[in-house]
Structures are given as C-alpha cells and as structure tokens.
Amino acid sequence: MNSKIEEMRITLIETAQKYGMNSKETIQCSQELDILLNTRIKEEMIFGRYLENSRM
C-alpha cells in the first residue's frame, strides 16, 4: 500500500506541475490519493483494534 501511495503522490506533483493546481487532472489525482490514504487509515484502525482485542 505504501508504494501505491508514494507513486500516486509523485503523480499528483507531476500532474500539478504540468496542468496547474486547479486542473481537473490534478483534482482527480488528488482524490485518488485521498482514497488510498483513507483506505490505509481504515486498515490501520481495524488492525489496531484487532491487536487490542487479541490481547484481552
């Protein structure tokens, strides 16, 4: 997951440099990165809860 996030972050930077910060291409990349980050956060929260419950 981390490599996908890093790849999308680089793509976002390159897209913003090429098309501008407010272009539809940049916004789309930003939204895709948001999805990846939110998924990672949810997975970490779920895994953290699993670890807490397994210690009980």
UniProtKB/Swiss-Prot annotation:
Q: Name one GO molecular function term.
A: protein dimerization activity
**TM spans (from-to):** none
Q: Where is the signal peptide?
A: none
**What Pfam families is this protein classified in?**
SpoOE-like (PF09388)
Q: Which UniProt keywords apply?
A: Hydrolase, Sporulation
Per the UniProt record, the source organism is: Bacillus subtilis (strain 168)
Name of the protein this chain belongs to: Aspartyl-phosphate phosphatase YisI
Known EC number(s)? 3.1.3.-
Entry's Gene Ontology BP terms:
regulation of sporulation; sporulation resulting in formation of a cellular spore
What top-tier enzyme class does this entry carry?
Answer: hydrolase
**What is the role of the protein in this entry?**
Aspartyl-phosphate phosphatase which specifically dephosphorylates the sporulation transcription factor Spo0A-P and negatively regulates the sporulation initiation pathway in order to control the proper timing of sporulation.
Q: What induces it?
A: During exponential phase and in conditions antithetical to sporulation.
InterPro entries (alphabetical): HLH_DNA-bd_sf, Spo0E-like, Spo0E-like_phosphatase, Spo0E-like_sf
- Tell me yes or no: is Hydrolase among this UniProt entry's keywords: yes
Return the similarity comment. Answer: Belongs to the spo0E family.
